[in-house]
């Protein structure tokens, strides 16, 4: 690897989180379960001091700077990829709420409880902003207060780690993927059948597979999310698994494979 490339990870934690979906169900604003790339880039922007959304129809500074950054996300302390959610009701008596009956707007939001994610970044320290991001993460420093999707859901991080021995994974053996990964087709035909078991064996966890369609970036013409299908699983996959050419798989040691998008 280029000596100026650094692969690091850090564990993001919050008491609550809300990654707003564009749709509403029975009057409730829904949240994505997983931390997606656009939301992560916003957190990175806060850490390094880049500006956010300021003007309608203009992409935020942090997104313009980090859109091509390779990242990976691994859920922590989840129930097979799922986090506990609770619907919280807010009363809004200002602004547009004055047009509502009684002058009070009731907002209901599905909220993640105690979400935590290990975030991997592939940084180029020749770039001044990425170098500053690296230094801030490793020293627990942020220019602005980062949050888990909403201003009131402050986030902190622990366990910043640098991987000195990481290498490109060449699909020369069967493997498990520690992070979320993008799928191009059904992954079921690539499962190593002998790795499947429904009940725990000794210290092993029952196998599971979790799917979610997540934002991967912004459509710059319509200023809406672009999406991709993601998988999170502890299943062993065969080396014939097909992957998106725009992504990169890395072996970071201790039999851990991650996909960076």
Predicted regions and their residues:
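Residue-level recognition of well-ordered beta-strand positions that form the cores
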Residues: 11-13, 72-74, 120-122
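Short loop/turn segments at secondary-structure transitions that flank enzyme active sites
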Residues: 15-18, 50, 77-79, 125
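Internal, well-folded beta-alpha domain core
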Residues: 76-261
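N-terminal, Lys/Arg- and Ser/Thr-rich interaction peptides
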Residues: 1-29
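Extracellular structured ligand-interaction cores
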Residues: 5-7, 68-70, 114-118
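Glycine/small-residue-rich interface belts in oligomeric ring/scaffold proteins
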Residues: 23-95
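Sterically constrained small-residue positions within well-ordered secondary structures
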Residues: 1, 62-64, 110
């Amino acid at each position: 690897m280029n000596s100026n490339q650094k692969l690091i990870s850090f564990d993001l934690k919050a008491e609550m989180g809300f990654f707003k979906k564009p749709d509403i169900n029975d009057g409730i604003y829904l949240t994505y379960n997983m931390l997606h790339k656009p939301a992560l880039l916003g957190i990175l922007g806060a850490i390094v001091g880049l500006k956010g959304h300021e003007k309608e129809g203009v992409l935020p500074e942090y997104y313009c700077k980090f859109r091509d950054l390779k990242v990976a996300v691994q859920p922590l302390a989840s129930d097979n990829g799922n986090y506990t959610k609770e619907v919280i009701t807010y009363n809004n008596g200002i602004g547009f709420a004055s047009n509502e009956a009684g002058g009070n707007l009731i907002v209901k939001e599905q909220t993640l409880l105690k979400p935590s994610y290990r975030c991997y970044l592939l940084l180029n320290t020749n770039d001044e902003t990425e170098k500053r991001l690296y230094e801030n993460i490793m020293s627990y420093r942020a220019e602005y207060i980062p949050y888990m999707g909403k201003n009131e859901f402050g986030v902190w991080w622990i366990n910043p780690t640098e991987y000195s021995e990481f290498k490109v994974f060449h699909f020369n053996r069967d493997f498990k993927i520690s992070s979320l990964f993008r799928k191009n087709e059904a992954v079921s035909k690539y499962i190593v059948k002998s790795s499947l078991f429904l009940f725990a064996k000794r210290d092993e966890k029952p196998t599971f597979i979790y799917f979610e369609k997540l934002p991967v970036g912004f459509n710059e013409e319509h200023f809406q999310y672009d999406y991709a299908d993601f998988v999170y699983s502890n299943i062993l996959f065969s080396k014939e698994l097909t992957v998106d050419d725009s992504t990169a798989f890395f072996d970071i040691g201790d039999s851990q494979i991650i996909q960076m998008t």
